Amino acid sequence: MISCLSRSGIFWLCCLSACPLVSWAQSPIVRTASGPVQGAIENDLTVFRGLPYAAAPVGEQRWREPQPVQPWSVLRQASTVGASCPQKRGLALEGGGDPGVIDEDCLFLNVFTPRAEAGAKLPVMVWIHGGALIFGSGGLPLYDGSALARRGAVVVTLNYRLGSLGFFTHQALEQERPGGPVNFGLLDQIAALQWVRQNIEAFGGDVTKVTVFGQSAGAQSVLALMASPLAAGLFQGAIAESPYGFPGHTRVKAAATGAAIADAVGLPGASASMDALRRIPAERLSALEGKEVSLNTSFITGDAAVPLPLLETFQQGRQAAVPLIIGSNSDDASVVLAFGIDPAQAMQKLGMGRSAVKAFYPDIKDDRQLGLAMGRDVGFTAFARRITYLHSQKSPTWRYYFSHTGVGAGSTGAGHGAEVPYVMGTIRQCQCLGQPATPLDLAVERRLGDRWFAFAATGKPEGSITWPNDNRGRGVVLDIGDLDTVRPAFMSARLNTIITGLKWAGSRAARE
């Protein structure tokens, strides 16, 4: 999810991309396992948009695992993004851009490649968009993969089922398939990665160098993929930008929410049949997102894709042993403002008195700013540190803190999602709040994109200064500000106290 708050607290509007120079006449044809496709030459790249990686999850296929695409033999033009998955348009406009056409037939991906030919063996970067698992689209201009592709990567962006169409159960579904799948959106992501394994070499990619990366709910998805036995072996590197430490949902809670959803659309709650639930128009379900009857933000624990709570999987060391970059932003908690949450009230709900919180942040006088600072550290910074500690015992792990306050940034720091246009290299297209990118913004964009590409290519985020991996989670951070600065023991005392208070610590070593 993107918030990138301005000083007036307004969310980024969608970054409209400049029209690329497009040619279809000379675009190469790629033969996928499902059939031949032809993209478009955009400037110096070949781009394939709207490629189906799974069959339409409609009718009887709603709330089922993604199914294979029906093969085709006639050349398929792949020059237009596919429909976005059902969502509430107003939320999407505030969190990344207009999703365009919305339809339940939405399981599409896009491929950006500098060399659409088998045997090129380029690193592959698979982007998973954020949006609290209830909105967003892989086809948004903000997520255009061209800049990373020009560095030499094959970039894939994708859609996955959202909201109650993507993460759902109900008494009738539990009876239909006891213990069956409930995290359909995550299964979509896994299906997309399986498509990558099967097809990406034809687009110039190296199937042995696949990195998954995402922001917010996309970062949470990256960690869930690392934790999921169903995704084992489908990728070799991971980047999680601002994942959050919110707990997942149990199947029991999710089923109760499913009953509430049925009731909200006029069906008899827990007694509703699956036939009746599958006949509900998708837009009626999307209209409920962001309300109390919506799950929002987290996965459901207890199916084959998410057998255990995410943090528990990492605590047991059962996650994929792949190199990881993980980090957070200096004003991540500003995202709560989009949902009408008062940071001061949220601080009180944490169960800590103002004086206790004030001791953490003696220089902050305003309760609203105290709430934002505490929310940032509890929801994002401490969680990233905890995951770093746990994963660094298994694989190289690098942690960052994005503090650059550039275009559209708020006075309290870099908002939730502020790093995304720097990573994707779309800052030039973003006339966010009418402010053009500065030379400093472009320098940060270049450094960050170079590091992410280097990680995908080599397994190490090499750059102008050495970024040490955080051996056993001791608190080493790369502060990505106007310059890159390595900070040892970053916020250690405060974060240790938070981790202990949240009972994430587990051992003394985790707090050191």
What role is predicted for each listed range?
Residues 23-183, 431-451, 457-466, 483-485, ...:
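Non-catalytic accessory segments of hydrolases
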Residues 95, 191-194, 198, 224, ...:
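Substrate-access "cap/lid" subdomains that shape
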Residues 1-12:
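Bacterial N-terminal signal peptides that target proteins for export
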Residues 106, 178-201, 259-260:
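Alpha/beta-hydrolase active-site loop
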Residues 203-215:
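Alpha/beta-hydrolase fold nucleophile elbow
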Residues 214-224:
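Glycine-rich nucleophile elbow surrounding the catalytic serine of serine-hydrolase chemistry
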Residues 223, 300-512:
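C-terminal subdomain of alpha/beta-hydrolase-fold enzymes, centered on the catalytic histidine
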Residues 10-20:
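Bacterial N-terminal signal peptides
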